[in-house]
């Protein structure tokens, strides 16, 4: 039933889109994970003001980024992104398996078309991708397509929204953009709010809630993915995040409203001998502080199985540090991040992202919903971002790790044949003018990695050409 409702809603969206007046002007309500470098620059410029920016919960509404010093940055950003149509061609010699928050190319070969619009309190995007990669079955994808409506200080919408929950740049343990976004409905805070009573010490509060449908081929088909996140910012420097994501319902599973309430408030774990759901939850912290003209960030994220008392068990974690500064108004950053998805801080295998009933695990179309390294893995990465001009940037990183360290289990996307590895990655973005830009990525690894039972090349490159009009 949920699947039918979502599909009908999406069809309604397309009808509205096709017959909407042509007087709509270009616009986008969201800043997406791929715009992370722009958000870093905003973080730097806004830190000295009493207007904290929550950079741990993507997508980010434009209203959350408004500060006195950010206005010019926002104008420059949108002046380069104010064309309402986009045509892209992407090519890679192999699947690009080691990705981070900036990487949006999930397929070997594809071409896509986007159209964005905004009118009064409504904004949306129609994005259609033709996937011609032999490794995937989906011929057409709608990643990024959405219809959003502003209701007071909230955004209500439907679509395929890319999310990234957590302060990390390389891994988000609970929700990342590694897999394709799923169809669903959502409610997000527009600009956040503050309590005016005895709870004012909490500071600025933002929230995000969604119900998605996992429409892939699973052990339990028609599973729903339900997520909620709240962040609080007691001061300009500190951001605390609390997240929970649940797999609920599906074929031959408890899915009544009563079961939903029992699961939502953790009133009970089982019904008729069946686990009500598969939940993971946890918290994260990011602290920024200035030293001379440098912004220093320290962060961590801890996620585990959600228990009856709302306390995560069998924990996995990410921690990192980053330095951000500007040179002649251009971004420079250096960061180091470490992730460990072996449960109980490295002592328990075959637990993270797995479940006894939802046997397909915490994945969508055989790609992780959380950390790209999947379960039982470790990953360390050193990254630098250099903006050479407003139209030219370089992202370079060195990394090492080990996938599925105990080499067991049938559902881990990295299989059971990988060894310790090390490598480097470079990404270059260049805009020739307002209309035409390209992205070039090169990944070099010292071992032939296995991903979804396919052997990857040691050197992978991808090229993206984008025409905006």
Where are these regions (language model features)?
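Outer-membrane beta-barrel translocator domains and adjoining extracellular loop/strand segments
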Residues: 98-101, 136-139, 168-174, 198-201, ...
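N-terminal periplasmic/intermembrane-space "pro-region" immediately following the signal or transit peptide
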Residues: 25-103
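Outer-membrane beta-barrel pore domains
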Residues: 273-469
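Residues on the lipid-exposed face of transmembrane beta-strands in outer-membrane beta-barrel proteins
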Residues: 111-119, 145-151, 158, 185-191, ...
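Surface-exposed coil loops of outer-membrane beta-barrel proteins
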Residues: 96-98, 161-231, 241, 248-274, ...
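Transmembrane beta-strands of outer-membrane beta-barrel proteins
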Residues: 85-89, 122-128, 156, 200-209, ...
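Short loop/turn motifs that connect adjacent beta-strands in outer-membrane beta-barrel proteins
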Residues: 52-53, 76-86, 116-125, 150-153, ...
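Transmembrane beta-strands of outer-membrane beta-barrel pores
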Residues: 93-97, 119-121, 128-134, 151-153, ...
